[in-house]
UniProtKB/Swiss-Prot annotation:
It is found in: Membrane. Keywords: Membrane, Transmembrane, Transmembrane helix. The chain crosses the membrane at residues 30-46, 84-100, 130-146, 213-229. InterPro entries: Myelin_PLP, Myelin_PLP_CS. This is Proteolipid protein DM beta. It is a multi-pass membrane protein. GO terms for biological process: neuron projection development. Pfam families: Myelin_PLP. One of its GO terms (cellular component) is axonal growth cone. Belongs to the myelin proteolipid protein family. PROSITE patterns: MYELIN_PLP_1 (PS00575), MYELIN_PLP_2 (PS01004). It comes from Squalus acanthias (Spiny dogfish).
Amino acid sequence: MEENMEEGQTQKGCFECCIKCLGGIPYASLIATILLYAGVALFCGCGHEALSGTVTILQNNFEVVRGAGDTIDVFTMIDIFKYVIYGVAAAFFVYGILLMVEGFFTTGAIKDLYGDFKITTCGRCVSGWFIMLTYIFMLAWLGVTAFTSLPVFMYFNIWTLCQNVTIMESTDLCFDLRQFGIVPIHEQKTVCTLNENFSKLCQSNDLNMTFHLFIVALAGAGAAVIAMVHYLMVLSANWAYVKDACRMQKYEDIKSKEEQELHDIHSTRSKERLNAYT
């Protein structure tokens, strides 16, 4: 009988511990972190492969040659973008972890009646700092989203020409890389619908794959923007709660001091009356 009671108390203790642990998880920050990681993974992975596909298309179909020496050409820029992608992936992996840790600490401070004054003050400063950083990163991701839409637009034009090539058999339409700033203005790198290179481009899998990879990368950048907005809402709410916690803690301190003073006054008067009576 006693063993059964002990087992029941142990199970109850484990259940309460699990509930307490689950209650301390910052679910809003967790959702935003998952969305951020998904968006960054899609953008970085698909963007990297799309850039590699772009190099293949430029070399095989547009006959663009990599410049010799330290010349800054489109291939050099693509290599730079790839290194930027590596940095973005690493930076936002760390930033997501930091925001999750901040969410855990802030949620813990709020759960404990607003925690102790030093913790809530620190949490308030950290939340304010992260709000500023997240707002800057949101603007940066908006710029990345706008920039990623440019290759999507370019590939959409080529893909549309390939889809309608049978309708425009007698029309010779050309796609000039100079209008997108990919090659210098003095170099003429064009592909026309009546050209053999255009037929090879449309029949290859590189165009279709690269186009859709850029679309997925654009969707990933959009998901990262949504994650940043979500983080801003979470951080703003946490900052407001922690600010309220500081005020509540100050009120409790003032109230306890007043009660202590009243208690001391009553004690002093009681002693005076007792002394006067004796």
